[in-house]
């Protein structure tokens, strides 16, 4: 494993950035169940701004990580299976990481970004159900793009989590396939 204290510090910093996400999501859920008024519309715009600020902080967090926290593409499945539910491998890239801890923290980061985007999309669609609002249209495009990217990267990490052969640190430490 890399610098354990550095890894814990990065994980702690991610937690501090993400700590308000459940509250933000709860506020959005409550707001979106209310009738529209000038004050609730302003609140929705404020929630969008706040979720975008948290997302920006998450992106900044990712930019501070050392190079060994980045994934490497170990393989690519090009063929689209007939039935995704029974496919042996997910189509697309297969990412590997230095160890499972790092992969888990990176996926926590991705989920946090998805939560931010869900608030943006929820508030924007509540403000403009027809999708024609110059205040929120570009925010929606960005939110959809970021969400798709995060989902794709989480999906690309699944083979790493499911295959001992893709986990270099476990093998280096002499762990067997059961993690012992």
Where is each model-derived feature located?
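Central/C-terminal regulatory/activation regions of fungal transcription factors
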Residues: 1-128, 137-164
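A phosphate-binding catalytic loop at a beta-strand-loop-alpha-helix junction
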Residues: 167
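C-terminal amphipathic "assembly/sorting" segment characterized by alternating charged
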Residues: 171-180
């Amino acid at each position: 494993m890399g610098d354990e204290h550095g890894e814990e510090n990065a994980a702690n910093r991610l937690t501090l950035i993400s700590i308000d996400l459940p509250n933000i999501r709860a506020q959005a859920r409550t707001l979106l169940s209310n009738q529209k008024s000038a004050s609730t519309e302003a609140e929705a715009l404020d929630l969008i701004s706040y979720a975008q600020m948290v997302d920006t902080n998450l992106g900044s967090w990712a930019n501070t990580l050392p190079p060994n926290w980045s994934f490497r593409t170990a393989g690519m499945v090009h063929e689209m299976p007939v039935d995704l539910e029974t496919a042996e491998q997910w189509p697309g890239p297969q990412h590997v990481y230095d160890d499972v801890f790092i992969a888990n923290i990176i996926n926590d980061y991705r989920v946090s970004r998805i939560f931010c985007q869900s608030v943006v999309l929820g508030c924007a669609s509540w403000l403009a159900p027809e999708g024609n609002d110059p205040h929120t249209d570009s925010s929606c495009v960005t939110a959809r793009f970021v969400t798709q990217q995060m989902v794709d990267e989480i999906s690309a990490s699944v083979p790493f989590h499911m295959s001992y052969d893709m986990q270099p640190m476990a093998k280096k430490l002499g762990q067997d396939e059961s993690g012992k």
